[in-house]
Amino acid sequence: MKYFDELKRSMEYLASDSRTIFIGQAVAVPGTAMSNTLTDIASEKLIELPVAEEMQMGMSLGMGLNNMIPVSIFPRWNFLLLAINQLVNHIDKVDVMSNGGYSPKIIIRTGIGSEHPLHPQYQHVGDFTEAIQKMCTTIEVIRLEEPEDIFPAYEKSLLRDDKKNTILVEYGDYYNKI
C-alpha cells in the first residue's frame, strides 16, 4: 500500500459522489504534488482558481451552504493560513451562529511541504495542526501519517453526519515513498 496510491484512490472515491466538487489552485492543471492525485477526476468536477486563498475558503462555504460538498485543496498549511478568517470565523462558527440552521459539509485538504529531495525553506513546511485544533470547535483535523490512514479518513469526512467539517493533513515527503 503506497501513500500516493491511497490518496489517488480516496480522491476517486470522493469524486464518485455527485455532490462533491474539487476547488483550488492546480486542481485542473498540473502544478503541485496534489495535482497528480486528481488526474482521473472528470474535468467538470474541478474548479481551477487563482491564488486567492481567502476567496477560495469563502467559496467553499458558499458551496457547502448550497448542499454541495467542496473538497477545498490548499497544497500546504502555509497557504491555508491566508484563509484563516473564513475558516475560523465563518466555517467553524456557521452552525453555532445559525442555531443549527446551516451545517455545510466541507472537506479541506492540505499538506506539510516536503523537505526532500530539496528543502523549499521554512515558509513551506509548517504544520499548524495543533493551532487550528485549538481555534476551531466544529472542525476535526486529521493527520494522514500512514497509507492505511488515508482512505478511512477521507471516507469519514464524506460520510460524517455529526455537523463537523474535516481538514485532512498530508505529508509531502510521503508521496514518493514505497
Language model features: what each stretch is:
Residues 1-178:
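Thiamine diphosphate
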